[in-house]
Design a protein with these regions (language model features):
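Recognition helix of helix-turn-helix/homeodomain-like DNA-binding domains
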Residues: 25-40
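Short basic helix-loop element that most often maps to the first helix and adjoining turn
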Residues: 4-23, 48
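Short, charged recognition helix plus adjacent turn
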Residues: 12, 33, 44, 61-70
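Conserved hydrophobic/aromatic packing and binding residues within compact polymer-binding modules
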Residues: 6, 20-21, 31-34, 60
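Hydrophobic side chains within well-formed alpha-helices
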Residues: 2, 6, 56-57
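Conserved amphipathic alpha-helical interaction elements at protein-protein interfaces in regulatory
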Residues: 8, 12, 52-55, 66
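DNA major-groove recognition helix of helix-turn-helix/homeodomain DNA-binding modules
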Residues: 25, 44-59
């Protein structure tokens, strides 16, 4: 579920993996492993992504279906 949310958020923002990876200061390959579920997302990266997409960490993790942060 997390992988789908990451991809959906990125696509809804009309961004490619390279752009998000640049924001995070990592390679596109490294970021793509988060989207595919090959690697777990470190907490600090999760927090950065939530801020970047203006959503909650719970939404990205699939704990909540509420997209807007509370």
């Amino acid at each position: 579920k997390t992988m789908n949310r990451l991809r959906d958020l990125r696509e809804d923002a009309d961004l490619n993996q390279t752009r998000v990876a640049q924001f995070l200061g990592m390679s596109q390959t490294g970021y793509s492993k988060y989207e595919t579920g090959e690697n777990d997302i470190p907490t600090q990266v999760l927090i950065k992504l939530a801020g970047f997409y203006k959503t909650s960490t719970d939404y990205i993790l699939g704990i909540s279906d509420r997209r807007d942060p509370q």
